[in-house]
Amino acid sequence: MCGIIGILGKRCVTSSLVESLKRLEYRGYDSSGIATVHNGRLYRIRAEGKLVHLEEKLQKTPLKGNLGIGHTRWATHGVAVERNAHPHVTERLAIVHNGIIENFVELQKELIEDGYTFETETDTEVIAHLITRALKSGLSPQEAIRTSWKRLQGAFAIVVIFEGEDNLMIAARSGPPLAIGYGKDEFFVGSDAIALAPFVDSISYMEDGDWAVLTREDITIYDVDNQPVKRPLTPLFEGALLASKGNHRHFMHKEMFEQPEVISHNLAHYLDLGNYTVRSFQKLIDWKKINRILFASCGTAYYSTLVARYWFESFAALSVDNDVASEFRYREPPINSDVLSVFVSQSGETADTLASLRYCREYGVKTATIVNVEQSTMAREADFVLPTRAGPEIGVASTKAFTCQLATLAAMALDAAKQRGFLAEQAEHQFVQQLAEVPRILNEVLKLDNKIEQICRNLVNVKGVLYLGRGTSYPIALEGALKLKELSYIHAEGYAAGELKHGPIALVDEAIPVIVVAPYDRWFEKTCSNMQEVAARNGRIILITDKKGAEAVHLDILSTIVLPNIPEFIAPIIYALPIQLIAYHTAVLLGTDVDQPRNLAKSVTVE
């Protein structure tokens, strides 16, 4: 999985396919490949590793054809070797795929019983054989795609070309994004605008459930009900390759909705989702030699490390210190060889965090950095780099980078526990399965977008907001308060729920809403007691909980945001999304500049 490109034109498409794949490298990959149709025949070349290896093969064996597809893959099902690289080819078609097919084992068994042979370990090959079987039954390519699509469970975006069809490409989207590009005498399909920017004049974004039939003469998009639809065209120019909001009003909204996909990319990097195990960090970090972790970060990244503290201490029995990077150097903490210092930053350029990293390096301490920009200064200077793979984040208020930081830290904590002998095999499978469910659950939460917008109408005229959380929900409450401050300019404070009676309760009245982050976990009953205290003082409560929590609360609640029931381990990642949506919609209702809030910068490069 990772990046998709398809081109249908009147000239050889090979060089444009490779150029587009280069523009998708930021998404991360471990193999690549392209396939073309020339004189009705399918041709394919794939390579393990970087794109330069694919280019070397193409120099030796050039591919012809004015119709082709390309792919950069991060291994999910199947190891990172050439045979598992995309495109996958049968005697009837070539296909590229982004996503995960959840029922591929069941479908694979069915196809094997039907006489099909599998050459790879990937879930994508199941799609290829399903469509091929449908074609052999006499269905048209369009009918074969639709019939096969109905059998698939999971999230996927696919682009397919066919043997014997020099003028046909079909794309389908169920989850991961796909954009259609309109160039001069050429049509394109790609994972995002970045891949298409040099070649097209405008793009349209396929919506979830759409599928598209492309010929040189026309493009027809069908919706989930198989009805022809028109999707809005967005002008695109080279300088705006990062400046497309798609069908969203703001970059922040787009980036919140990208979280299911980018977290699936992240998890594929750190987890073996086929075997439900953690990919070992041992080549980077020998956890048996580590007795203490020191986190230093700023803002939202700092809150991600506060969540991680619970994970590392409870799973791996490691002592954890959390510091705001801007204060870290001033207290001169004692550090030695058994300490791992970890620095989290979206940009990898945050001045205070970078200065803290350099401080630790001066003392010979091992340094690891969790960054979204892999070419950043912090990535170059740290001993170990753990990329979040969230993709470009344009909105100043971090959303998808934050949840990808949490996902990275969760995998890191599981690996530490495993290496140190505190994580049994069965428990490892259980926790990895829980993480694997995160993209699906986030998609469910995104369906609450309109409801949350309505709830936020209660916040537009308030003088302040309190956020409460307990356990791993406490850092999420802190992040919620920060987001609301950043975007809406409403004063907001986050507190540990147990601290309410130690001062903040003095603020509680009808004018100060209290947003409570309270999944139904081992701390839920105690948090309910805090809500009782708020209700007794006529406080207005907005409760973010799950179905069990909503049923257990018998209070006069202003509004309740009900999420799916989920395990405690992954709750911080899931509950981050509704607090982002609250901040976003409140800011939109107030008319503030959501993507570029006043006085804030995406990358803080001064101390």
From Swiss-Prot:
- What GO CC terms are in its UniProt record? cytosol
Q: Where is the Glutamine amidotransferase type-2 domain?
A: 2-217
Query: Which chemical reaction does it catalyze?
Result: D-fructose 6-phosphate + L-glutamine = D-glucosamine 6-phosphate + L-glutamate
**Where does the protein principally reside?**
cytoplasm
Q: Which GO BP terms sit in this record? A: carbohydrate metabolic process; fructose 6-phosphate metabolic process; protein N-linked glycosylation; UDP-N-acetylglucosamine metabolic process
Which range is the signal sequence, renumbered to this chain?
A: none
Location in the cell: Cytoplasm
Catalytic residues at C2, K602
Q: Which SUPFAM superfamilies match?
A: N-terminal nucleophile aminohydrolases (Ntn hydrolases) (SSF56235), SIS domain (SSF53697)
What one GO molecular function would you report for this record?
carbohydrate derivative binding
Under InterPro entries, the record lists: GATase_2_dom, GFAT, GFAT_N, GlmS/AgaS_SIS, GlmS/FrlB_SIS, Ntn_hydrolases_N, SIS_dom, SIS_dom_sf
Ranges for domain SIS come to 277-422, 455-597
Judging by the UniProt lineage, the source's domain of life is Bacteria
Matches recorded under Pfam families: GATase_6 (PF13522), SIS (PF01380)
UniProtKB keywords:
Aminotransferase, Cytoplasm, Glutamine amidotransferase, Repeat, Transferase
Reported EC number(s) for this entry are 2.6.1.16
* Protein task: Catalyzes the first step in hexosamine metabolism, converting fructose-6P into glucosamine-6P using glutamine as a nitrogen source.
Q: Subunit notes for this chain?
A: Homodimer.
Q: Mind telling me what this protein is named?
A: Glutamine--fructose-6-phosphate aminotransferase [isomerizing]
Q: What gene does this protein come from? A: glmS
